[in-house]
Amino acid sequence: MRINKFIANKGICSRRKADELIKEGKVKVNGKLVIELGLDVNEKDNVEIDGIESLESQNLVYFMLNKPKGYICSSSDEKGRKTVLDLVKTKERIYPVGRLDYDSEGLIILTNDGDLAFKLTHPKMQVSKTYVVKIKGQIKESELAVLRAGVKIGDVKYNKCKVKVIATDKNWTKLSIVLFEGKNREIRNMLDFIGKEVILLKRVAISELKLGGLSRGEFRPLKDFEIEYLKNI
């Protein structure tokens, strides 16, 4: 088994985060520093991670959180800012799946299931994420067409997305935006590219899993059928 999957299966972090820990020189196998991301290990190997006292397997848990503004999607923050883990109380060691930036809000899944985290975040899986975005002013059909076609900003290519106007006023416009990838600050950067200022950015669904009536800052365990649905996307 590849070492990143081994670590993820123990509920430590996602496969992607495990790769980061290896690159940072924080993982040892049988006393030797791991330098190969694709290293194969098994249960007989002694795997150590800096700062983690035990790699005993945990019960898998799954939570939905309505993240408020002012929290970061990380297990810790070197700047001392509040993280989403401050809002979800559980004895299991969990981590957020994907991210919402500091000033955004809405649906975040937290779990210790590394395989599910991998499935929901890997670009090749094309799992849709739906957002409600409120911007200042109006938006032209030609500008919507630019967003739908995808844009390149510097060296970063943002792929096609689904965009439609769902409400409008003389001072603002509310959009529904569906993404199929998860680049950092993707929506904000695309809207800035066409000269639009974001007032509100809220994720309301991951594939067909919807935030529903969960209040800001509240969380709940995912129901069995929701977990099965996500695993079978």
Regions found by a protein language model. Give the residues of each.
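Basic, flexible Lys/Arg- and Gly-enriched helix-loop patches that mediate nucleic-acid binding at interfaces
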Residues: 1-233
